Design a protein with these regions (language model features):
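Intrinsic-disorder-associated, low-complexity terminal segments enriched in Asp/Asn/His/Tyr and depleted
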Residues: 4-5
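Residues that scaffold, gate, or flank divalent-cation-dependent active/transport sites
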Residues: 10-139, 145-147, 151-161, 166-169
């Protein structure tokens, strides 16, 4: 389920129920949408849903692989992990040089938001842009459904990470 595309949220929400030995556990999976490209858009004060941007190293030539493309590029039919020469010549776009340190900083800041809601032992980081949270013991504490809790976290990420960077000059 995509959440709040109209305000530029960059998160895919997945709520997973997992039954273990007759005990139901509820996990949230937050997968940051086209993370590298979205970070590059935010850093440039651009909306990832309305910006044509690819993350690639052009010094490697037209055969360079795009590490990420913005959601807008995907809507135009451009495939993630394509090569530069595979992007239709009619599509105008911004090329962002990969900045792994910057992506790690954003990921760490987002992890800090997760820690506002969950103990670290209930957060299972899968990759730089995806984490699973065992929400089982927190739903009652926060008096929320899994979807409500996930949406609350997403709003926090949007306001703390995205909005603060977007309006920072």
């Amino acid at each position: 389920m995509f959440t709040n595309n109209k305000n530029g949220a960059i998160i895919i929400l997945k709520v997973i129920d997992w039954r273990v030995k007759n005990m139901q556990r509820t996990y949230l999976c937050i997968d940051l949408k086209t993370f590298y490209a979205s970070v590059e858009c935010v850093e440039r004060h651009l909306d990832p849903f309305n910006t044509n941007l690819v993350v690639a190293d052009l010094s490697r030539g037209k055969g360079a692989i795009c590490l990420a493309i913005s959601p807008k590029m995907k809507m135009l039919g451009v495939k993630n992990r394509c090569r530069i020469y595979e992007i239709p010549p009619t599509v105008k776009y911004i090329v962002a040089l990969p900045r792994m340190k910057k992506y790690i900083e954003y990921s760490a800041n987002i992890y800090a938001i997760y820690l506002k809601y969950f103990a670290k032992e209930d957060i299972h980081v899968y990759s730089i842009d995806e984490a699973f949270m065992d929400a089982t013991n927190y739903l009652k504490m926060y008096n929320m459904t899994a979807v409500e809790l996930a949406q609350t976290i997403i709003k926090d990420i949007f306001h703390i990470i995205i909005v603060s960077n977007y309006f920072e000059y």
